[in-house]
Structure formats: C-alpha cells, structure tokens
Amino acid sequence: LGLKVLGDMQKIFQTRHPVIIYPASGTGAWEAALSNTLSPGDHILMFETGQFASLWNKLATRLGLKTELLSWQGTDEHLPNAPGWRRGVQADLIHARLLADKNHEIKAVCVVHNETSTGVTSNIAAVRKAIDDAKHPALLMVDTISGLASAEFEHDKWGIDVSISGSQKGLMLPPGISFNAVSPRAIEASKTAKLPRSFWAWDEMLEINKTGYFP
C-alpha cells in the first residue's frame, strides 16, 4: 500500500522523482523544503503574493536564512497597502534580480503557485524560464498547497526542485498530511545543506520509503 500511495503521488505531482510524505501541515512541508536544501545564512529570493507567501518568508527568516522579498510593482486602489496581494509573481523582476546576482549568492527562489488567501495563480513555467534565461543555479521551490489537483501543475516539466503541498485543499482529504516532491538537484543539495533537521530529514525517509514503509 505504501508503494502504491507514493507512486500515485508522483502521478499527481507529474514527476518521476520522489515524493516525501509527512504527518504535518503545509507549514511543516515549508520547513522541510528549506531545511533539507539550505545552510544558515543562505540568501533566498521570495515573492510576496499574499498571506501565505508572507508567512513562508517569516518562517525562512526564523530558520536563520537571509530572505529578500520581492513585491509586485504597481498600484492597486482596492489594496493600497498591499498591491501585490491581487497579482501573481512577476517573472521579469526575478529575472532582473538574478541577472544582478553575479556571484550567485542567491541559493533558492521560493514562490507560491496558488495563493490561498486571494486565489491568485502564478505562472511557474515563466519563473523557471526567468531563472534559466539568467543562467542562474538557484533552486526553484514552489508552494502548491492550494494549487495541486486544483489547477494544472507539472513538477518535472516546469523544472521545479521542491514542490510543497498538503492534503486538505485540491486533494480533498482531511488536514494533517503534507508533501515534498523533490528533484535530483534538490536531493544533491541536501547532502551539503547545514540547517539542522531531524524529523524533516529526507535521507532516512527516502531510504525507508524504498520498501513502502516510513520511519
């Protein structure tokens, strides 16, 4: 049964690579994604599209990461204090920022696919293209907690390194289960990442998952 569930989750994420399952909320899967791939003080680029993008940024800061939060460039008469909360990610801003990062200090780009608080959906394929066009090695991490199984999502095709999701939205299951879909690049990064982790550690989970069981 365990192997079937893991295989079926790969189909939902549209990936040939591992999907890790946690008994946790989506917040736990956020932390798992960051702690398995990054080290204290690493610089990450995030984009404010709503409440959950802001909360993910807050969590990353608490983990000891250096976060840089980009915001939508423009005005909104309905939300003058938070105009980006009614707009998706601007891939051109990510492209420009990565081009300026000549020393490749930015280790990851973190964006929300579908912002639960507003319903705004971002073009993840465009974000991947922005990273590639800038010839930047940053990992791409995507929160698709309310997007998975609700809107088109292609982990492999869109070149995502870590996709984060949960059970209670598009999958229409009880809350309390969350997921990391991980690329080979993400797994390789986890071998040198220095952020502390125990419960969230991918290595032991992946090893035992090969048998269809969990630690």
Task: Please state what every model-predicted region is.
Residues 52-54, 75-77, 147-149, 169-173, ...:
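Short gly/pro/ser/thr-enriched loop/turn and capping motifs at secondary-structure boundaries
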Residues 78-148:
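Active-site phosphate-binding strand-loop segment of PLP-dependent enzymes
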Residues 1-32, 51, 55-61:
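Conserved N-terminal alpha-helix of the aminotransferase class I/II PLP-enzyme fold
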Residues 28, 38-105:
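PLP-dependent aminotransferase-like
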Residues 156-168:
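Conserved active-site segment immediately N-terminal to the catalytic lysine
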Residues 20-23, 46, 69-71, 110-111, ...:
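General beta-strand structural signal in soluble alpha/beta enzymes
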Residues 168-215:
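Active-site C-terminal subdomain of aminotransferase-like
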